[in-house]
C-alpha cells in the first residue's frame, strides 16, 4: 500500500526538481558540481521552496534569550540556522533545502533545457563489444568467487541425505565437492563507442577564472555525452608551449603557466587517436579551450594539422575561446577562415561564466 | 478505523502507563481518556508531518515536513519523543526506540498536555472531534481534486496557505463585529434618510426671511452634509477594520464554490491550531512541570536516573538566541508555586523595600499548587508573562533581550533591564510572533481594491515575502491589493495590481 506520506513526499520531490530545472542555468554556470564528480548523486541547495507569508524581517526585530554575556555582545547571526530568534523559539527558521539528484537526471534536464538533440552515432552504429556477466555457477573456481549460500546448501543437503545432520548441533562442513563458484558468461552487446578529447590551454595568459570556465563547460559536456553513449572514453590534454596528456583529475586541478603553442595539443590529440581510437570504430569528439592567444607563427601549423589529421576523422571539433584580460584572442579568426569548409568545426566565444550555458548549446546543438 | 496503525501498548508499557495515569490523577490532573500508541520513528514522523492527524488532505508540504524530520533524525540533529493531539479522546504517540525511563517521562509529560488541552480556556472552543473533521476536509479536498485536477487544486492550496496566518486567534472568544447590513437593508434605510431632508418652504418674497430664516437653513444644510458624511462612512466596507482577513475573503472574495471551500478548510484548520501557538510556553511548561514532579517523586529507579537526568536536561537546555519554551514555562510555574506558597505577592510584599526581608519572605500560605492550577486554566502565554514575570525571576534565569543590529547584521544582547526584557518578550509573543494585519478597506479608492493594514510595532515586514504574498492575495481578490506598513521607518503602501509591484510612501492626511 502506498502510504499517504509517500505520495506527498514524491510530489514535493517533483516540485523541488522543478525548481532545479528552473534555475538550471545558475547551477550550470557556477562550478559547484565539479568537486562532486564521481559520486552517484549530487546535492543541490534549493532555496525558497517555502510558501511566502507576511512575516517579520530582521529590521527592528529581536527577542529574549538566556545565558551569560554583556550588553552589546553578539549572539550569532539570525539567519539560516534552527529556529529564528524573535519568535520565542516557535517559528521555524529558514532552511536551505538540498535536493539529491543523479548526474544523469541533471544531464537530462540540461538536454531538455537546451533542447539538445540526441546524438546520432556515425558509421557502423551496431558495433559489438564483449562483456563478462556473472550469471552462472560452476563447481570450480577461485575462492574469491565462492558462492557461500549455494555451497552450504549443498553441504546441508548432503549431510541430511547421509544422515550426518543433527539439528541439535547444526554443524555443517562443506567438502570440496560441495563447493560452488560464481561464473561468468561472455555476452556480446551492441555498443556505440565515443572518444572525447578535451584540450585546455593552461598558459600564463589563462587566469584562474578562465580555467574555471573551461572546466565547468567541459564538465557539463562530459556529463551530457556520458548520457548519450554507453561506453565513453575520455582523454585529457593540457598545453602551454608543450602538450601533456594528463588524467581527468589533473585536468580539473592543474595550474600552469608559460607560452602558448596550440599545435602541440593537436599533435598530442592526433597521437592519442592513432594510438587508442581507430576512427572507423569510434565516434570522436574534440573540445578545445583557449583564450586564443597563440604564438603567431604557430597558427598556420595549427590549421594545417587540423585539416590533415583531425577534421577528417572527428564527429565534432569544437573550439571554445574564453575571453581573457591578457590574451589577444586572435586564434579564432584563423579558424573562422576555414569554418565554411568543415561543417564539423564549431566555434564559440565564451565571454564569462554566464556564457557557458549558451556555449554548450552551440557545441552540442548540432546533434552530431 | 481512523488510526490505521493502531497497536495496543505492550504489557510492560501499559503497566507504566497505568501507574503514571494514577499519579497524574492523584495530583489532581484532569484529562480526557488518553489512547497511547507506540510507533517507530518513520511512523511518528509521518504523524508529526500531518500535525498529529493520520488523515489529512494531500499536499506536498506534509511531504516536505516529513522529509525534514527524517533527515534531521538521521543526521542526529533532532528527535521526537512523543506527540499528543488535542481531541477527545486524546491520542498520544510514543517512539518505540525510547528506553523505559524515557517512556515513563514521556507518558507523564503527555498527561500534562492532556490536562492542559482539556482545561485551558484557550482550548475551550476547539473542535474535540478534529480527527473526524480533518478526515472530512480530506474527503472534500479529494472531491475538488477529482473535479478540477490535482495541480489546479494544489496551486490554489498553495495560494491559500500563503495567507493562512491571517486569522483572528481570538475570534472564538470575542464577537468583534455587529451583524453586517445586507445591501437591500442599506438601500431602504438610505432612501428614507435622503427623503427626510428638508429645504425651503414656499413663501412670498417679503415673508421669506421670516419663513425661511437664514440660520435655520444653514443649520439644516449642515445637518444634511453631516448625514451625507455618515452615509459615505456606511458605504465604507467593512465598516470596522477586520482582523480575520481569511474569513473576510471567504465571505467577499469572488471565488468559485470549490475555491471558497478550500479556503474555508485552510481557515478552519488554522483556527484549530491557533491555541497551540498561543500557549506554547504554558503548555510545554505545564507538561514539563508534571513529568519532573512525577518522575522525581515516583517514577525513578536507580538505573533510570542518569537517563532521566540526561533527557530532562536536554529538554531544558537554554541557548542565547532562542528562548526554550519548556524551560521558561516550567521555571515560571515553579516560581509562581513558590511565591504563592510563601505569600510573596500582594501589595504588602510588592511595597516592601527591605531587600533582606523580601528575600526571606515566607508566610507559609501553601497556596502554590492551587495557584498554578488556576494559572493553567485561564492564561495564555502573553497574559502569563505579563502577569507573572518578575525582575527577580529574570535575574535568576539570566534573561536578556536582544536586537538586530542592522550595521553589522548581527543579533546583539540589548539589555538586562526587566522592563525591556518583558516588553521584548511580549512583543515576540504577540500574535505568535507574526505581524498583525487587518482588512482596512475593501473598496479602496472606490475601485474595489483591497487595503490591508499592518499594525507596526517596531519590526518591519520581510519585503520580498510580503510582495510574494500580495501576489497570492491578488489571485484571490482579483483586484489590486495594497498593504500599509512601514519601510525604512516611513509609512509605506505596498501594492500589487496583477502585473507589477509598487511601493509608495503614504501621503500625509
Explain the meaning of each model-derived region.
Chain B
Residues 117-185, 284, 288-301, 314-325:
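Post-HExxH zinc-binding segment in Zn-dependent metallohydrolases
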Residues 69, 89-106, 274-282:
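Short pre-active-site segment immediately N-terminal to the catalytic Zn-binding motif
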Residues 43-70, 173-203, 218-219, 224-227, ...:
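Extended, Lys/Arg-enriched charged tracts that mediate electrostatic binding to polyanionic substrates
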Residues 107-116, 290:
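Active-site His/Glu-centered metal-binding helix of metallohydrolases
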Residues 5-9, 94-97, 117, 123, ...:
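Fold-level signature of zinc-dependent metallopeptidase catalytic domains
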Residues 230-330:
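Long, internal scaffold/assembly segments composed of regular secondary structure
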Residues 101, 224-227, 304-509:
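Non-catalytic terminal regions of proteins
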Residues 3, 11-90, 213, 217-253, ...:
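Auxiliary, metal-adjacent structural segments of Zn-dependent hydrolase domains
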Amino acid at each position: 500500500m502506498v502510504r499517504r506520506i509517500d505520495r506527498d513526499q514524491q510530489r514535493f520531490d517533483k516540485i523541488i526538481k522543478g525548481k532545479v530545472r528552473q534555475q538550471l542555468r545558475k547551477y550550470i554556470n557556477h562550478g559547484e558540481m565539479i568537486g562532486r564528480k564521481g559520486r552517484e548523486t549530487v546535492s543541490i541547495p534549493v532555496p525558497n521552496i517555502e510558501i511566502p507569508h507576511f512575516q517579520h524581517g530582521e529590521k527592528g526585530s529581536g527577542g529574549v534569550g538566556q545565558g551569560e554575556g554583556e550588553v552589546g555582545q553578539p549572539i550569532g547571526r539570525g539567519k539560516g540556522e534552527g529556529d529564528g530568534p524573535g519568535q520565542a523559539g516557535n517559528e521555524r527558521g529558514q532552511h536551505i533545502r538540498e535536493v539529491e539528484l543523479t548526474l544523469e537526471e541533471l544531464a537530462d534536464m540540461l538536454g531538455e533545457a537546451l533542447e539538445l538533440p540526441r546524438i546520432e552515432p556515425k558509421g557502423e552504429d551496431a558495433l559489438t563489444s564483449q562483456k563478462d556477466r556473472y550469471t552462472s555457477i560452476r563447481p570450480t573456481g577461485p575462492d574469491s568467487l565462492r558462492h557461500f549460500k549455494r555451497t552450504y546448501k549443498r553441504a546441508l543437503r548432503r549431510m541430511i541425505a547421509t544422515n550426518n545432520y543433527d539439528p541439535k548441533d547444526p554443524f555443517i562442513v562443506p567438502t570440496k565437492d560441495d563447493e560452488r563458484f560464481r561464473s561468468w558468461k561472455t555476452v556480446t552487446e551492441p555498443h556505440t563507442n565515443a572518444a572525447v578529447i578535451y584540450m585546455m590551454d593552461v598558459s600564463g595568459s589563462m587566469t584562474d577564472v578562465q580555467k574555471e570556465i573551461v572546466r565547468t563547460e567541459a564538465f557539463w559536456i562530459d556529463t551530457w555525452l556520458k548520457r548519450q553513449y554507453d561506453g565513453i572514453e575520455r582523454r585529457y590534454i593540457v598545453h602551454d608551449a608543450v602538450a601533456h596528456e594528463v588524467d581527468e583529475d589533473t585536468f580539473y586541478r592543474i595550474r600552469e603557466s608559460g607560452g602558448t603553442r596550440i599545435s602541440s595539443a593537436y599533435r598530442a590529440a592526433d597521437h592519442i587517436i592513432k594510438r587508442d581510437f581507430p576512427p572507423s570504430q569510434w565516434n570522436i569528439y574534440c573540445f578545445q579551450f583557449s583564450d586564443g592567444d597563440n604564438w603567431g607563427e604557430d597558427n598556420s601549423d595549427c590549421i594545417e594539422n587540423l585539416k590533415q589529421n583531425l577534421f577528417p576523422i572527428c564527429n565534432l571539433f569544437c573550439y571554445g575561446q574564453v575571453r581573457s584580460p591578457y590574451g589577444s584572442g586572435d586564434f579564432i579568426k584563423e579558424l573562422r577562415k576555414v569554418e565554411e569548409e568543415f561543417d564539423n568545426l564549431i566555434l564559440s566565444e565564451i565571454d564569462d561564466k554566464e556564457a557557458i550555458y549558451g556555449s554548450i548549446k552551440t557545441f552540442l546543438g548540432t546533434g552530431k | 478505523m481512523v488510526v490505521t496503525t493502531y497497536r495496543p501498548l505492550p504489557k510492560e508499557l501499559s503497566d507504566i502507563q497505568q501507574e503514571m495515569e494514577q499519579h497524574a490523577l492523584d495530583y489532581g490532573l484532569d484529562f480526557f481518556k488518553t489512547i497511547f500508541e507506540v510507533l517507530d520513528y518513520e511512523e511518528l514522523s509521518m504523524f508529526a508531518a500531518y500535525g498529529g492527524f493520520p488523515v489529512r488532505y494531500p499536499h506536498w508540504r506534509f511531504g516536505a515536513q516529513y522529509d525534514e524530520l527524517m533527515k534531521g533524525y538521521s543526521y542526529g540533529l533532532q528527535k521526537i519523543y512523543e506527540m499528543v493531539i488535542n481531541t477527545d479522546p486524546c491520542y498520544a504517540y510514543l517512539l518505540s526506540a525510547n528506553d523505559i525511563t524515557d517512556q515513563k517521562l514521556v507518558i507523564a509529560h503527555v498527561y500534562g498536555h492532556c490536562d492542559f488541552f482539556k482545561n485551558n480556556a484557550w482550548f475551550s472552543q476547539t473542535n474535540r472531534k478534529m480527527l473526524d473533521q480533518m478526515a472530512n476536509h480530506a474527503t472534500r479536498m479529494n472531491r475538488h481534486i477529482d473535479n478540477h485536477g490535482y495541480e489546479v487544486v494544489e496551486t490554489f492550496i498553495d495560494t491559500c496557505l500563503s495567507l493562512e496566518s491571517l486569522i483572528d486567534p481570538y475570534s472564538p472568544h470575542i464577537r468583534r463585529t455587529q451583524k453586517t447590513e445586507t445591501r437591500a437593508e442599506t438601500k431602504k434605510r438610505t432612501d428614507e434618510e435622503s427623503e427626510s431632508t428638508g429645504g425651503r418652504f414656499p413663501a412670498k418674497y417679503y415673508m421669506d426671511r421670516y419663513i425661511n430664516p437664514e440660520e435655520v437653513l444653514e443649520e439644516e444644510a449642515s445637518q444634511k452634509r453631516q448625514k451625507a458624511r455618515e452615509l459615505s462612512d456606511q458605504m465604507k466596507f467593512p465598516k470596522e477594520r477586520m482582523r480575520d482577513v481569511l474569513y473576510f475573503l471567504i465571505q467577499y472574495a469572488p471565488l468559485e464554490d470549490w475555491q471558497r471551500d478550500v479556503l474555508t478548510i485552510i481557515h478552519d484548520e488554522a483556527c484549530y491550531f491557533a491555541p497551540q501557538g498561543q500557549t506554547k510556553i504554558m503548555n510545554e511548561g505545564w507538561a514539563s512541570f508534571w513529568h519532573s514532579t512525577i518522575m522525581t517523586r515516583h517514577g525513578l529507579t536507580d538505573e533510570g536516573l542518569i537517563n532521566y537526568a540526561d533527557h530532562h536536561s536536554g529538554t531544558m537546555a537554554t541557548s542565547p538566541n532562542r528562548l526554550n519554551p519548556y524551560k521558561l514555562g516550567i521555571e515560571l510555574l515553579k516560581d509562581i508555586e513558590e511565591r504563592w506558597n510563601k505569600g510573596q505577592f500582594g501589595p504588602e510584599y510588592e511595597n516592601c523595600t527591605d531587600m533582606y526581608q523580601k528575600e526571606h519572605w515566607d508566610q507559609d500560605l501553601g497556596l502554590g499548587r492551587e495557584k498554578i492550577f488556576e494559572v493553567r486554566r485561564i492564561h495564555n502565554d502573553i497574559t502569563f508573562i505579563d502577569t507573572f514575570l518578575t525582575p527577580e525571576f529574570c535575574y535568576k534565569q539570566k534573561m536578556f533581550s536582544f536586537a538586530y543590529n542592522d550595521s553589522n547584521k548581527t543579533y546583539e544582547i540589548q539589555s538586562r533591564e526587566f522592563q525591556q526584557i518583558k516588553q521584548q518578550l511580549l512583543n515576540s509573543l504577540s500574535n505568535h510572533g507574526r505581524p498583525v494585519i487587518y482588512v482596512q478597506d475593501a473598496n479602496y479608492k472606490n475601485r474595489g481594491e483591497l487595503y490591508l493594514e499592518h499594525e507596526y510595532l517596531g519590526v518591519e515586514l520581510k519585503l520580498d515575502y510580503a510582495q510574494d504574498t500580495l501576489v497570492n492575495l491578488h489571485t484571490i481578490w482579483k483586484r489590486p491589493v495594497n498593504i500599509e506598513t512601514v519601510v525604512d521607518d516611513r509609512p509605506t503602501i505596498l501594492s500589487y495590481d496583477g502585473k507589477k509591484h509598487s511601493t509608495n510612501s503614504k501621503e500625509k492626511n
